[in-house]
């Protein structure tokens, strides 16, 4: 993995990387195709942003993600932000709202990962096997009720994985439609059909919408946290909210990070 002598990415390609609207068009595919062929390890310089490196080849990405000594995550935000947004974020909160495993360097990453790893051992998961099979039967029944024709995604594939995850987490069954709504709103920009309705929404407004949805989801998990501290059960939420690292309860941002990485 070596940068070329002129590693600077041409302006038209660099600008697309920070333009939310580009992610709803084929222009982004063209950009990454050009980068992989001509400048796989380049630096983007865009007005309003600090210069940032862009790694586009698979093996290089693997090398970077596995070498946290040379490429530490540090205290940088999990998403690319312009200077104004980064400054505002630093001024309005002392610690990040969400700190997940994917944002942690060693040795912190392993300490937090080990908090829940025992819960996912086969012996423990077998205790929930019948509940998960019941969810699968309900999902299959919904498909049968379509009468041989219907939307498999909205009728089956969106619901069943979420139902299993929420069962593991400890979310009550009656709250599943609400959680499905929130997860769809968070990941709406990745859906080609939703992209068509979003393409004309200004980037700043879109960011506000997604932040509001995330805040709503975290508000729900705050209530779940309070409930599990009062009434612990055998679910994963109970493990997370009562977890400790180095003899101290985990921070609210780390707790939020665990919820988000599991729920989404």
Ranges and model annotations:
Residues 172-174, 225-234:
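Proline-centered turn/helix-capping motifs that create local helix->coil transitions or kinks
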Residues 180-181, 229-240:
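Short, charged hinge/linker segments at domain and secondary-structure junctions
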